[in-house]
Swiss-Prot record:
InterPro entries: ATP-grasp (IPR011761), ATP_grasp_subdomain_1 (IPR013815), D-Ala_lig_Van_CS (IPR000291), D_ala_D_ala (IPR005905), Dala_Dala_lig_C (IPR011095), Dala_Dala_lig_N (IPR011127), PreATP-grasp_dom_sf (IPR016185). It comes from Xanthomonas campestris pv. campestris (strain ATCC 33913 / DSM 3586 / NCPPB 528 / LMG 568 / P 25). This is D-alanine--D-alanine ligase A. Its EC number is 6.3.2.4. Pathway: Cell wall biogenesis; peptidoglycan biosynthesis.
Length: 373
């Protein structure tokens, strides 16, 4: 498609969104845009503002305060976009124009959090018959919901931290003394469907529990109460569809009480990363195998970052599977692949190729009943 006389592949980069991770998404989008191979790809920038409206953005100036993670913002273009599900082509249309946009060949969604990586956006793109980077509806939805993900991982024979789950309607039944007796202190209280440690609290005493529960319920209708796991925080990147590969492992060394949103994206001194992690080859292989098993158990595709705790007794406890990991300047996913021999640009290219391959495979499936004479 990119040879002599052939046009470049048009990549729709979708970013922003209504979630609490809006700013993280903007940082990721900026980096991915810079990493796109200009010889092969033509970017089309689609920003979603905090009200959920889609806008066609200019490549040169789509961000405000791009170098400041605490102030970065989406510059509104004023040109709204609509999606036309079911069309074979021209699925994106400017609402103030007569004609559709030039055909987008593949979408790279980098909308973190609710509505972006929980299967919602993936379902819309699938209905619009657009290839997209990353996991499909099922893998995205299950991995995003920490309660459901833990149940699936546990059933697959992987160890997860002991936990209890409460909804907005059952939160009054969350007895802190019972939870402390069951899990000990500290406890972690977190929204079931958020990422980047948004709304997460470490509870060190019974008196701190109510405020932590209230904070988590501001971000989700379902809340997880989790036992703290004493162990090193190790991360492994996974790449691929049916036959995924695992990267070298990295370690997050947290200087604060836990790996909070501020520590991850705002402060420069809250944590350090060590790549590759200082672990022996056998331990790394075990973690890689657990990461691959978790990836396939959750029906992931394209990419995911698998976070685990490595305990002093050698146990590997799965903490989280992130199907849409960050691509910011400090994000582990691209760093892990770079340490494994795959540079940032090659990684982005491979993710786009995987999206096109999966879409082609899906296109071979029957969409109606086939009868034989």
């Amino acid at each position: 498609m990119t040879g002599a006389g052939m046009r470049r592949i048009r990549v729709g980069l979708i970013f922003g969104g209504k979630s609490a991770e809006h700013e993280v998404s903007l940082q990721s989008a900026r980096n991915i845009l810079q990493a796109l191979d200009p010889q092969r790809f033509e970017p089309v920038l689609i920003g979603i503002d905090k009200q959920g409206q889609w806008h066609l953005s200019a490549q040169e100036s789509f961000l405000l305060d791009a170098d400041d993670p605490s102030r970065i913002a989406l510059r509104h273009s004023g040109r709204g976009l609509a999606v036309l599900p079911g069309a074979a082509s021209a699925q994106l249309r400017a609402v103030d124009a007569e004609q559709a946009l030039a055909q987008i060949d593949v979408v790279f969604p980098i909308v973190h959090g609710t509505l972006g990586e929980d299967g919602s956006l993936q379902g819309l793109l699938r209905m619009a018959n657009l290839p997209f980077v990353g996991s499909g509806v099922l893998g995205s939805a299950v991995a995003m919901d920490k309660d459901m993900a833990k149940r699936v991982l546990r059933d697959a024979g992987l160890e997860v931290a002991p936990f209890a789950c409460f909804t907005r309607h059952t939160a009054a039944q969350a007895d802190v003394q019972t939870l402390i007796a069951q899990f000990g202190l500290p406890l972690f209280v977190k929204p079931a469907n958020q990422g980047s440690s948004v709304g997460v609290s470490q509870v060190r005493s019974a008196e701190e529990f109510s405020a932590a529960l209230e904070l988590a319920l501001r971000y989700d209708h379902k809340v997880l109460v989790e036992a703290a796991i004493a162990g090193r925080e190790i991360e492994c990147a996974v790449l691929g569809n049916a036959t995924p590969q695992a990267s070298v492992c990295g370690e997050v060394v947290v200087h604060d009480a836990f790996y909070s949103y501020q520590t991850k994206y705002i402060r420069d001194d809250g944590a350090a990363t060590v790549i590759p992690a200082d672990i022996d080859a056998h331990t790394q292989h075990r973690i890689q195998q657990c990461a691959l098993q978790a990836y396939q158990a959750l029906d992931c595709a394209g990419m995911a970052r698998v976070d685990v705790f490595l305990c002093a007794d050698g146990r590997i406890v799965i903490n989280e599977v992130n199907t849409l990991p960050g691509f910011t300047r400090i994000s582990m996913y691209p760093k892990l692949w770079e340490a494994s021999g795959l540079d940032y640009r090659s990684l982005v290219t491979r993710l786009i190729e995987l999206a096109l391959e999966r879409h082609a495979d899906d296109g071979r499936l029957y969409s109606s009943v086939v009868t034989h004479a």
